[in-house]
């Protein structure tokens, strides 16, 4: 069937910012789809609000709009561009919901835009719980006993019929937003209220819990001629009841009999045929472990997180082929790009095992609610490939970067068995490691199965891993046992611990006895057809399939799983670095382990090694490939942390030298440099004991910022105002010691400024300077950044330019450098220098059209910036105003305080651009999910130190027509300043403010921290109530000021004559 010739221009909707439940997998899918449509000769227009993606690069689509993903903005683009068609199934839930809104409002019809891919009626049939259930009944496919509710009362009526436990699933949401498992009336009321709030259709499905069934997924493709195939099937190790995005997953499934596999395969294909899916689709099923009974849980009629995993697990490019199916091509006429010889209608076959483990943000949010359920909490994931289940699991564990290298916890032996069992029953993010610990203590597999319902197949594999540990201990230094442990994925580090040797000794022993990994190709067909994909995984077997060429090579280390503080921005830089290496005539090799990203698409680099980012795994690749060198500055802290160990082993670190990377991090050396080049920094000291920290703080004068050295994303960083708070910090957050010094700095209040620069050793170019809206003290990743600066004087800009140039040259930077400054009342101070790519690189690259990561890579390979046509210093400004606004995922993380501070909390970002600051901010705030209204009610409750400043904001909000509610102290202050205000009761009193928030009477909350960070504090409850009821809550008066500017610019002031 030839492609659709009636259309020329296609609008693609992206998925917007990275949030929990919708991460980098959509950048990967969108990039693939846009390129596939261009390959077929269509003109592609892309709209997405996320500047950190490869997808929003000008090369990917013919026209790129970085605008808010709201009905109004997309409708404007449709009216302006007049596309022939819209492809909505590649932008996650956001893209789907937008398509439905644009259709319902008549925008598509009135502009003659047709929807490509799966028809809207099919999308609604899959997403609307009522329609889906009735279709399943017609097909005679069992669904769990359930009811559709639009009110809490209806939910209680259903509970009377079936009893607890119940699962609540809101319609048209993703990542299980607003859903959950309920065991009692209190939970049912809370979850249903939440779920109805988050569902665009105010509709929830309530079903009898089938927790404990096996959860199986099929990733399927269908075209318009009804050809349908299964690309990959996957099994969740955790039974039904934990969101698949939070489950440990294995592919292909390991515990199904052939009869069960075929039965569920047939059901999956029957369902997508009945729905009329055209493209990729994910089907989730529950199978009773004790019979052939099964239920269908849900169908995602779009490309999803699971399809990114299936693509990387098989090499079969689902999003690319889904885009081509959408324009009318069929599976039997498209070649599989991996083999180049077989057609896309052949189902992939795997001769290896894939393990996926989610990456959770609880290293950042220690007080967060860790228990897992149907609402997703992971920010990212890792994948590993092995020849046995044990090998792939252990490789995935050491890819997580939790400081865990094996099936157990770092200080596992210190826990007593009762505590371990309690944690296993709790089913949280560390359960897997506690299971390992329990087996180590001799707990029977029967007892663990009883507690977890995890299949014996997997429990036996865990037991096998523990058995190998015992064998190693009993046969220290034995080569046969060493080889056996390597076959099952043990790292040298773990073997060393059992052998009572150092890691280097085990490494040496291995090499002397020629025990080293070979690299196998991922070819989609288990070697049934000829294939030549440059996509490899390491394993301890015989034949090496990775042919080493005689071209000069450069290895780029990726940034691993998406987490808070290290997002898709680093993947963006990695991909650009690879393109620059290829353009310079070298062979570019990527090592990474994140299945969601563009960098792990095998068509990007000359070779892709899907391996853990550890010294051992990376060294094995270096030993084989013998590269010119390794690039670490694009992979975030993950790659930087490997630099020292690699250099010790004689590896050439390309770009800024290891010595200079360390100079930027080492307190004393950095201070010496600043004195030499005459750049001021806030007074600070290093403490190696709690006593010394107190002494330092008193000498410098409070408030001080305290933090451990060598961290990314401001982990464990705090501003403290007195001895008691400092003592508390040192006891709870960081044990200060000679190995782990704590930095104590004077906290300067002032405007924070961020600068990115590129240096080739001689010339320093500064693509742009960004000014933060929130004053210093809020982490740069959580601040709203503005380009070009709006309030800096010419003199300030000259100083920033001069300091940046001095720092880049003083540190002998080759490549990128990111610097944060504070402009205090008495001048500019340097706060922090990062000698690597930063999270603002994609944002600045897009604004200025300076391909920063590529230029940095060219400088690293020895080219001169002056030869490339760049003048030194600050580059000319781009016209317009651009803001980068943070996006948070607090609605998915219970018990997490949303107050902004030095520790980063946002999961993603959006960009707003326009001709004035107010318009750009309006777009940035809108894109980040803050609905800016020109009237409404604002609730203000601030700490004493903020009251004077708050009066000014309240006065302006009142003048544009906002009604003001405030708690007693704040209300008194406002009344004293003649501002109309209504006093609301404190929490727990009559007419309390939480009730006002829950009843939807409040549109904005302004709440600043009162010291004494106990969770019970009222402020915490106010902030959480805001998040859980979808009300924007501003915890910084700077943000409140900016929002007030925007509201003023939208409305007219009303003043009497």
From Swiss-Prot:
| Ligand binding (Mg(2+) 2) | 298, 300
Binding residues for Mg(2+) 1: 284, 298
> Which UniProt keywords are listed?
Amino-acid biosynthesis, Arginine biosynthesis, ATP-binding, Ligase, Magnesium, Manganese, Metal-binding, Nucleotide-binding, Pyrimidine biosynthesis, Repeat
Q: Where do the record's region annotations for Carboxyphosphate synthetic domain lie?
A: 1-401
Give start-end ranges for the coiled-coil region(s).
Answer: none
Reactions performed catalytically: hydrogencarbonate + L-glutamine + 2 ATP + H2O = carbamoyl phosphate + L-glutamate + 2 ADP + phosphate + 2 H(+)
Annotated spans, Allosteric domain: 930-1057
Q: How is the cofactor bound?
A: Binds 4 Mg(2+) or Mn(2+) ions per subunit.
Q: Where does Mn(2+) 1 bind?
A: 284, 298
- Binding annotation for Mg(2+) 3: 820, 832
What residue spans carry the region label Oligomerization domain? 402-546
Cofactor(s) the protein requires to work: Mg(2+); Mn(2+)
Magnesium as UniProt keyword: yes
Residues binding Mn(2+) 2 are 298, 300
Q: Which GO terms describe its molecular function?
A: ATP binding; carbamoyl-phosphate synthase (ammonia) activity; carbamoyl-phosphate synthase (glutamine-hydrolyzing) activity; metal ion binding
Recorded hits in Pfam families, A to Z, give: CPSase_L_D2, CPSase_L_D3, MGS
Q: Which GO terms describe its cellular component?
A: cytoplasm
Its EC number(s): 6.3.4.16, 6.3.5.5
ATP-grasp domain boundaries: 133-327, 671-861
Q: Which residues bind Mn(2+) 4?
A: 832, 834
Domain notes per entry? The large subunit is composed of 2 ATP-grasp domains that are involved in binding the 2 ATP molecules needed for carbamoyl phosphate synthesis. The N-terminal ATP-grasp domain (referred to as the carboxyphosphate synthetic component) catalyzes the ATP-dependent phosphorylation of hydrogencarbonate to carboxyphosphate and the subsequent nucleophilic attack by ammonia to form a carbamate intermediate.
Q: How does it assemble?
A: Composed of two chains; the small (or glutamine) chain promotes the hydrolysis of glutamine to ammonia, which is used by the large (or ammonia) chain to synthesize carbamoyl phosphate. Tetramer of heterodimers (alpha,beta)4.
Q: What is this protein called?
A: Carbamoyl phosphate synthase large chain
Q: Which species does the entry assign this protein to?
A: Staphylococcus carnosus (strain TM300)
Upper lineage: Bacteria, Bacillati, Bacillota, Bacilli, Bacillales
